[in-house]
């Protein structure tokens, strides 16, 4: 008889809840294990079958570690601020708070139905004032350290998103917003910015301290984009102005025949001649509607306008024209580049189009044929002539420094983090702007600054957030009658998720972010599992905040997440990404109802390697359920009683396969190879079906190994095997090294190379002993009688060949 998943799952989930089975144990004598999932945004759609894949992986690790004697921290919470709730509220007139609370309730119900061993007493919610008090507190520490500042900056302005809001560079894809696909324009606006660039080197170098996939480390390094080169200063002719250029190729300075500066560069208006003014203004207007990606597309036609101004190349005194072009971004480097058209494809196209001189500085090739990529000896370069590239770079940097016209410099692709958002549904920034120009933080003892309730959360229309509409909240007066306005922008969704793993350690503490001793006890996170889509942003921001808190002495570790694993994507059965529009979304509620939570957990772990994307298959789901039924029937009869072939004695027939299974499953779990661990348990179950008697101790071991993957069934089987109190803290099975291989082997006996008999002997028996047994074998004696044994060839554990004549 098959097991009844509905009854069993409800029974054991109730048991875990009543007994607080998974409440985190604080025990100084136990080693710790902190297993963390990337907490979800509680959307209106609810959980999809992709979520449980990562959650099951961390749950397997957590359950195994408890059984191995670890104290385990395995929490869950909600990344609940965010755009969809605000968009929903604007459409329906409902409060995003109510919408979010309802979604959380649904998510929690779904997650609990899957039997994950979370400590729900540590649940966090980023929209809870008791939580975001500490998000605001971290902002205040950043401000005090000079890492949060206000600046008018060119931002990505999406006028059609939420009635107008700023989006981060990372949220712009192909010139449109990642969410909704709305066009993005560049617009100057005063913003709060976090100085993540101050930590750029540490964010690269400390990747050596963590066990992360190489691909993710590489993505982070590329995003930060550290490059070593030189700053070079070009004097503007007939002016006291200087244009600073960063270049990774100072060896090519003699070949610089023009400068290009960004249309937004501070000097554009100051150096443009009256004759060029109209053309420059017109060009600047045209560029304002283009995204950074469009502007830097290598395939697009090069455009630009001559400013009328000239600069002086410091190394040879030559006068070179200064152009503006959209391919130079104000936000990268100095917003100005020296163009060496003979050796750079983009500069070559530009110079060719606008008929600007080209000077080759490396020998080899012909400019008529296109840009020169040869790097032979230097030519046309004065004191650098004849040098190789690296010598020329070093020599030129020394020359620049000696003459006071440049210096060695490290540049980064990473920009400071535009932190403010023109939205309602986010953490208020705890700042007041006073009428006399002073900006102050809200005193720490007045935190949290609560997000006010509002019925109308449409954008203000001025570029400010909807909070600007709430006069009673915005306008303040201090004790001296000085008037001020609260900051009306809110924090991005990244804020609450940049430190949540710290709050799980001590979620109810109202005096500090978390107790120092508890942070020392639990950090770093031992295992962090989530989607690769967060490879750059969330992980970079969380690491940045963690390093700031480390410098403040708040956290004890340099890095927050020791091991990172990215689960693959579960695709639709048609091998496409699941989406409502394609009609291939699978709802876990339906699977739990029809097959049971354990089946879903088993199937998602058996589909393939955790880190690879795999297509959903109804057949695979059926197969997983059938195998659970097979395990059940191995031990339980139709009367729901333990089968009588489960006995206390052990005849030894399953010794080797059992010990091999314990070893492989343990190793595979530790290395998160769950699919091969399941395969090994299938092999063991097949062997167990062939055995006449099943040692109870081996059946208990099997159930313990199954418990992390199919915990409800395992609890029921454990109970039927005669145990009380649940399986969660039962001791993890161990294996006997001596039983991993057969104790005996079968040896083939040959006479003159022909097989005449076989004998079973102890493995690794001495050669002399094996020879004696072979010669004494009755069948062999029939072939050797009356013959002379000339030679005996012994291959241990395999063959004895007797040569007779």
UniProtKB/Swiss-Prot annotation:
Family note: Belongs to the class-I aminoacyl-tRNA synthetase family.
Name of the protein this chain belongs to: Leucine--tRNA ligase
Gene: leuS
Cross-referenced InterPro entries: aa-tRNA-synth_I_CS, aa-tRNA-synth_Ia, Leu-tRNA-ligase, Leu_tRNA-synth_edit, M/V/L/I-tRNA-synth_anticd-bd, Methionyl/Leucyl_tRNA_Synth, Rossmann-like_a/b/a_fold, tRNAsynth_Ia_anticodon-bd
Subcellular location: Cytoplasm
Catalytic activity: tRNA(Leu) + L-leucine + ATP = L-leucyl-tRNA(Leu) + AMP + diphosphate
Keywords assigned: Aminoacyl-tRNA synthetase, ATP-binding, Cytoplasm, Ligase, Nucleotide-binding, Protein biosynthesis
GO molecular function: aminoacyl-tRNA deacylase activity; ATP binding; leucine-tRNA ligase activity
Record Pfam families: Anticodon_1, tRNA-synt_1, tRNA-synt_1_2, tRNA-synt_1g
Motif 'HIGH' region, chain ranges: 40-51
Residue positions of motif 'KMSKS' region: 577-581
NCBIfam families, sorted: leuS_bact (TIGR00396)
Domain of life: Bacteria
EC number: 6.1.1.4
Residues that, per the record, bind ATP: 580
EC supergroup of this enzyme: ligase
Primary site of residence: cytoplasm
GO cellular component, one term: cytosol
């Amino acid at each position: 008889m098959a097991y009844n998943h509905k009854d069993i799952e409800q029974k054991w989930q109730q048991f875990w809840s009543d007994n607080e089975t998974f409440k985190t144990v604080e025990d100084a004598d136990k080693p710790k294990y902190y297993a963390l999932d990337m907490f979800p945004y509680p959307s209106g759609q609810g959980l999809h079958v992709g979520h449980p894949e990562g959650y099951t992986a961390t749950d397997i690790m957590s359950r195994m570690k408890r059984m191995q004697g670890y104290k385990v921290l395995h929490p869950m919470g909600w990344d609940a601020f965010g755009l969809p709730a605000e968009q929903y509220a604007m459409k329906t007139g409902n409060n995003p708070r109510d919408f979010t609370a309802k979604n959380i309730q649904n998510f929690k119900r779904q997650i609990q139905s899957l039997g994950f061993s979370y400590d729900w007493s540590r649940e966090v919610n980023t929209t809870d004032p008791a939580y975001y008090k500490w998000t605001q507190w971290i902002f205040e520490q950043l401000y005090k350290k000079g890492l949060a500042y206000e600046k008018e900056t060119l931002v990505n302005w999406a006028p059609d998103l939420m009635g107008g809001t700023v989006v981060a560079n990372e949220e712009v894809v192909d010139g449109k917003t990642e969410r909704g696909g709305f066009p993005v324009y560049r617009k100057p606006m005063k913003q709060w910015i976090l100085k993540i660039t101050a930590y750029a080197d540490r964010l690269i170098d400390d990747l050596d301290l963590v066990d992360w996939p190489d691909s993710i480390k590489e993505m982070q390094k590329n995003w930060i984009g550290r490059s070593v080169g030189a700053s070079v200063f070009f004097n503007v002719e007939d002016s006291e102005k200087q244009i600073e250029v960063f270049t990774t190729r100072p060896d090519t300075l003699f070949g610089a025949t023009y400068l290009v500066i960004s249309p937004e560069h501070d000097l554009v208006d100051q150096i443009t001649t009256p004759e060029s003014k109209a053309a420059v203004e017109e060009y600047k207007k045209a560029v304002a509607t283009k995204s950074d990606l469009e502007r830097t597309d290598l395939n697009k036609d090069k455009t630009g306008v001559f400013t009328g101004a000239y600069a002086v190349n410091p190394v040879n005194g030559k006068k070179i024209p200064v152009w503006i072009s959209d391919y130079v971004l104000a936000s990268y480097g100095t917003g100005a580049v020296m163009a060496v058209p003979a050796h750079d494809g983009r500069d070559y196209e530009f110079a060719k189009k606008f008929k600007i001189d080209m000077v080759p500085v490396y020998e080899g090739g012909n400019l008529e044929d296109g840009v020169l990529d040869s790097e032979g000896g230097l030519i046309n370069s004065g004191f650098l002539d004849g040098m190789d590239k690296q010598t020329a770079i070093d020599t030129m940097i020394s020359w620049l420094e000696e003459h006071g016209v440049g210096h060695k410099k490290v540049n980064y692709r990473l920009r400071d983090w535009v932190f403010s958002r023109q939205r309602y549904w986010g953490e208020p920034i705890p700042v007041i702007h006073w009428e006399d120009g002073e900006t102050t933080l809200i005193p720490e003892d007045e935190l949290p600054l609560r997000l006010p309730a509002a019925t109308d959360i449409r954008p203000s229309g001025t570029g400010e957030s909807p909070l600007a509409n709430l006069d009673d909240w915005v306008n303040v007066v201090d004790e001296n009658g000085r008037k001020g306005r609260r900051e009306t922008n809110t924090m991005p969704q990244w804020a609450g998720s940049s430190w949540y793993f710290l709050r799980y350690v001590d979620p109810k503490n109202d005096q500090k972010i978390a107790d120092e001793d508890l942070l020392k006890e639990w950090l770093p996170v031992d295992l962090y599992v989530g989607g690769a889509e967060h490879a750059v942003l969330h992980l970079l921001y969380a690491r940045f905040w963690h390093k700031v808190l480390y410098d403040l002495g708040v956290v004890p570790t340099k890095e927050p997440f020791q091991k990172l694993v990215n689960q693959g994507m579960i695709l639709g059965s048609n091998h496409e990404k699941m989406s409502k529009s394609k009609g291939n979304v699978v709802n876990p509620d339906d699977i739990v109802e029809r097959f049971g939570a354990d089946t879903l957990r088993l199937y998602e772990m058996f589909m393939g390697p955790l880190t690879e994307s795999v297509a959903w298959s109804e057949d695979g789901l059926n197969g997983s359920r059938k195998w659970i039924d097979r395990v059940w029937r191995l031990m339980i009869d139709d009367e729901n009683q333990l089968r009588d072939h489960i006995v206390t004695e052990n005849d030894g027939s399953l010794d080797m396969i059992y010990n091999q299974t314990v070893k492989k499953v343990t190793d595979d779990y530790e290395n998160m190879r769950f699919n091969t661990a399941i395969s090994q348990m299938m092999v063991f179950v097949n062997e167990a079906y062939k055995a006449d008697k099943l040692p109870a101790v081996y059946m208990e071991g099997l159930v313990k190994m199954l418990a992390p993957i199919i915990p409800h069934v395992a609890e029921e089987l454990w109970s039927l095997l005669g145990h009380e109190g649940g399986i969660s803290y039962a001791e993890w099975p161990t294996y006997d090294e001596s039983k991993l291989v057969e104790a005996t082997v079968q040896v083939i006996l040959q006479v003159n190379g022909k097989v005449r008999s076989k004998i079973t002997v102890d493995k690794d028996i001495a050669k002399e002993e094996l020879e004696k047994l072979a010669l004494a074998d009755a069948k062999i004696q029939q072939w050797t009688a009356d013959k002379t044994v000339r030679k005996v060839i012994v291959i241990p554990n395999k063959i004895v060949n007797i040569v007779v004549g």
